[in-house]
Every structure is written in structure tokens, then in C-alpha cells.
Amino acid sequence: MSYRHLEQYVHGLPAEGSFSIWAGPVEGPAWVTFRDREPHYAASTMKLALVIAAYRSAEAGTLDLDDTVAVHNCFASAAGGAPFSLDPGEDSDPEPWARQGQRVALRWLAYRSIVRSSNLATNLLLDAVGTSAVMAAVHAVGATDSVVARGIEDAEAREAGLQNLVTARDLALTLRALVTGTAAGRDSCEEIVSVLAAQQINDAIPAGLPPGTRVAHKSGWVEGISHDAAIVFPDDAPPFVVVVCTTSTLDESTGLGLIAAGARAAWSDRPQS
């Protein structure tokens, strides 16, 4: 089968910068890949592995997702230095900030870290789960090139060389494992996919798809970086996975448009029933 639109998309990628794509079915060989094992700073895509780890830990009995923790803004650095705090102005979700001093469920933190990409919810959840459990979840799906070593805005850890890294291939492996029910227990995987489908920040992959298409995805962005990783559920074809990672000097709007174009190409090349 020809994947003409995806191949044209890859050939048209900018010469400067780092661009990666993985597109293909939930099971079986990829349709098209391009630099899919090239590492990128993960940005908020690391929250996908964190949430999977939280559900796996609940299944193992090491935490209860319905347990509550106090909402605060003081975190220990992964580098072992002075505590740090998050900048609320850099967070896309005001809800956890409005609950400072209150207790909230870990399940709610997992939800907010996906649907609004909350940085505060992410670090609170990471405190409960731990980076070792996150890495176990990463390795369980065969994502051998990714690293989650620290929380969000942990500048001291970043300066010490502790980075969160991801590849398009690893994100695709993770999403495929969610659909097949192997990233965690089947019920947990189904719940996580439902949370991903509830994401409210839809300016990358969903923007390249027909309106109303069900998309379960996690995006990530900081200056110079835009990623999105999605399970797409067409009405006329089996679900498929598309991941686009970009590290470049492109402005935010152009970077998002590039990701949307990749999604559009994958949609055009989907094998229809």
C-alpha cells in the first residue's frame, strides 16, 4: 500500500531543526517513520508515562488513586539541592492552583495533568509515584530511548544533567500499548485512553483531522519545542497512532501547523475498511 501523503510530508519537512514522525496502526509495522528514535526534550509528553505509572502503582497496591494529598508548591529537587517552586504563570491549568491548601485525590491530579497539562498536578503526582516507577512503566512498553528523571521546572536538576527525553517511536509504543491493554491492566488502559480523549488543548494533531474525530492524545510544548502523540479513532477505519516531535527555531504557530499537517497526511493515508 502507498502512503503517498505521509511520504510527501516527510520530504517537505524543514532542513533546519529536528523533526520526527511515527505513523501506523495499533498493531503491526509502521506506515511511515522518520528519525523516530531521535531524542527530543519531552516537555509535557512525560506526563503520559507518569499517569500510566500511577495506574500501574495502584494495580500493584503501592498507592491508592483515591488517596488524597495536600496541594502545595514546594518540591524537592531531583538533584538533591534546595527545594523549588513552580511559576503559576507558566501553567496552563488554574484549577490545582485554586486548591492550594486543600486535599485532592491522586486520580484528580492524573486527570488534570493530561486534560489541561497541569504542571502543579504533575509534580504533586510525581512526588507520590516516583521517577523509578515512571521509568518502569516506560520500559514495560519497550520504550528504551526515553528518560523521565525529574519534575517540571526543576532547574537545579536540569543544570545537573537530569533531563526528560522522549522519541516519537517510544511515544508510539506507549500509545499502542494503551490501546492493546498492555501498558497497564486493561481497565486502567481504557480509563487512561478516556482521559487522553478528554484533553482540552487541541491545537496540534486534532487540528489536522476532520472535526468531531475522536482523538486520545498528549501534547507538549516549551519554547522551540512542540510535540503531539495521538491515538486516532476514525469511523471508517481501525484506530491508528500518529506522533510528531519537533525541536526547532520555528515559532509556536508554525510548529503546531507542522504537526497538524502530519496528522492530516496520516488521515489521508489511513487504510479504510
Set out the residue ranges of the language-model regions.
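Active-site SXXK
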Residues: 29, 41-69, 242
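Conserved catalytic neighborhood of penicillin-recognizing serine enzymes
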Residues: 77-123
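Acidic helix-start/capping segments at beta-turn-to-alpha-helix junctions
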Residues: 65-82, 129
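Short, conserved catalytic-motif segment at the N-terminal edge
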Residues: 15-39
